[in-house]
């Protein structure tokens, strides 16, 4: 295995690990505990399954922590293609990671309130709004990521195009959720297809790695 392919696989595996932690907090936990527009039922579920909810908080923190290493691995893989764009990806991660950690603190705050029922939806909605706001920054991560993949020649160009579309999709989701929340679910339904680009790149990196001969051909 070449050093380039090894770097790609490390990045892919870390990407998968971070995504798994994210799915636990953003998909699995809400499906088990959160009841839309029902603060009483949501509060009861959280109190009845406090360990599960706390596990979701830990998963969210781990997702954010592992993402730092994902970004560093991607930087190592792609800096030779375009260092300014690769640095921009690192800068965005440095900016966005503290936001995730602060957002996790909002979840912890639920357990500190005497009137949990009155505050639970407030903090969960605040968590969601911060997630939406942070998605505005993802376009500044995924568009450079997509451009680097497209130019690399050792990764499929279609993945580069797809990742650029992922960045645009995150931006549209963020703007819709913040300004037109009634349409958020509709936009999310269509955006899911585009966001599968992240699944595609992480699986390609982890399974296929990178083709170093393509890099050699492009620099000759």
Question: Which residues does each PLM region occupy?
Answer:
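Hydrophobic, aromatic-enriched alpha-helical segments typical of multi-pass transmembrane helices
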Residues: 1-220
């Amino acid at each position: 295995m070449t050093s380039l392919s090894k770097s790609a696989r490390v990045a892919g595996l870390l990407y998968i690990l971070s995504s798994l932690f994210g799915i636990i907090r953003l998909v699995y936990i809400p499906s088990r505990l959160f009841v839309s527009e029902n603060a009483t039922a949501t509060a009861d579920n959280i109190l009845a399954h406090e360990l599960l909810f706390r596990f979701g908080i830990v998963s969210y923190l781990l997702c954010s922590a592992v993402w730092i290493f994902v970004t560093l691995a991607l930087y190592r893989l792609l800096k030779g293609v375009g260092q300014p764009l690769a640095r921009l990806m690192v800068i965005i991660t440095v900016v966005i990671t503290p936001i995730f950690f602060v957002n996790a603190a909002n979840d912890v705050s639920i357990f500190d309130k005497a009137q949990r029922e009155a505050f639970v939806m407030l903090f969960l909605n605040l968590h969601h709004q911060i997630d939406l706001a942070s998605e505005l920054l993802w376009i500044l991560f995924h568009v450079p990521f997509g451009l680097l993949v497209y130019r690399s020649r050792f990764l499929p160009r279609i993945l580069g195009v797809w990742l650029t579309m992922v960045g645009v999709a995150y931006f549209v989701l963020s703007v819709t959720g913040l300004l037109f929340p009634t349409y958020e679910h509709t936009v999310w339904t269509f955006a899911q297809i585009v966001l599968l680009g992240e699944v595609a790149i992480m699986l390609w990196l982890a399974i296929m790695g990178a083709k170093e001969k393509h890099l050699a051909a492009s620099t000759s």
